C-alpha cells in the first residue's frame, strides 16, 4: 500500500508540473519536469523494487536485498533522450575513473577475507550502475536544466516532508508514520522525531541536511532567493523536528563552510576579514540558537549518555575488525555479518557499563557501525580507505579553484551543494551510518559527482552570469562599439 501511495503522489506531482507550465511547455521544460519527478522520487525510502533477498536481516548499510532504484528507470529515459535528440553523440567517458571503479570492485570481491561476497555484490552493483546513470545524466542535460529540475523536485520534497513532520510529531498524528513506509519506526517516547517519507528520523534528518545545503547554495548565488530562503527555513525546521542532533550539527557546519569558502572566498581562511565578518557573527548566532530554542535536543543527559555508550561500543567493534584485517578489510557491505559471526557481547562487559542499555547485543550485531568512516576502513582496509580520504581532502581543498574557474552560477550551486554534502559526511558520518544508505546516497552522490563535471563548469549562461562576468562582457561590448565608431566610412 505504501508503494501505491508513492506512485500516486509522483503522478500528482507530474500532473502539477505539466499543468503549471501550460502553454509554455517546450522540450527543454519537459526535460526539467522529468528531472524534477526523478528528484522527488528519491525522497521515498520505499521507492525501490527488491529483486533478490539473501534472507538475512544482518546486511550492512546496503542491506541484504538486490533492488531496482528510481535511477534505473530514469536511465532508460536518458537512453531514449540520447538516441532521439543527441543521435548517440555523447562525450567519451573518463577512462581513468572507469578503471578506478573496476579496480575497487575487483579488489573488494577478490578479497580473501570476504566471506560474504553476495552482500558485496549488492553494493558494487548499486555503485557501478549509479556511475553509469550519472554518465548518461550528464550527457543528456545542460547544467541549467539540471538545476531547474532539481530545484522543482526538492521544493516538492521539502513541502511534503514539512507537512508530514507537522502531522507527526507536532500534532501527534501517528497514522502518518507508516504512510509512505510500512516499516518505518520512530524513536522512544523520550525523544520522538519526524519520519515523513523516510523510514527513520535519522535518515530523514540526513536527507534534509542535503537539501538544506542545496537551497542555501541557491540563496547565496541569488537563484530564486526569496523562495530559496523559505525552503532553507522549512528544511531547517524539518531537521529540528527529526530531533537528529548529528544532522543538526552537520547542517550548521555545512552552513559555516559555505560562508567561509564561498561568501568570503576572496579572503584567506583565517584572515581578519573572514574571522570578523563571517566566523564570529555566525558562531555567536549558532551558540544562541543551540543554548536557546534548540537546547531541548541536548538537555536529556541520560539519553546523551546512553547514545555515547552505544557509539563507543560500536567504535570498539570497528577497532576489533580493523585489528583483524587492517590492510584490505572484510569486503564492502560485509562488516555486520563479520561482526555477528566473530563478535560477542562478552567483550563489552569488561570495558563498558551496560546496565542502562536495552538489549545491547541485539543492537550491536543487528545495526551497522554508527560511523561511516569506521565502516569504510573496516570494509576496505587502509588500501581502499586512504584514497577515499585523500579524495575528500582534495575536494575541499580545490573548492575555491573550481568556483573561480566556473563561468556561471548554475554550476556554482552544484559546487556549493557538493561542499555542503562532504561537510555533512565529515560531521554526521562520525556518529551515524545513515549517510551510507542507498536512499540517501541517491541525492548526495548526485551533487558531488555533478560538481566535478568540467563540462558543466565550462557552460556559459548570460542570463544568470556572475557580476564579474557581466562586467567583463559589458566592457568587451563597449570596446567593440568604440572600435566600430573609429572605422572610416
Residue ranges and their predicted role:
Residues 11-25, 72-86, 210-220, 383-406:
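Hydrophobic, aromatic-rich transmembrane alpha-helices
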Residues 104-108, 148-179, 189, 196-264, ...:
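Alpha-helical transmembrane segments of multi-pass inner-membrane proteins
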Residues 163-172, 242, 259-306, 319-323, ...:
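A membrane-periplasm/extracellular boundary helix in multi-pass inner-membrane enzymes
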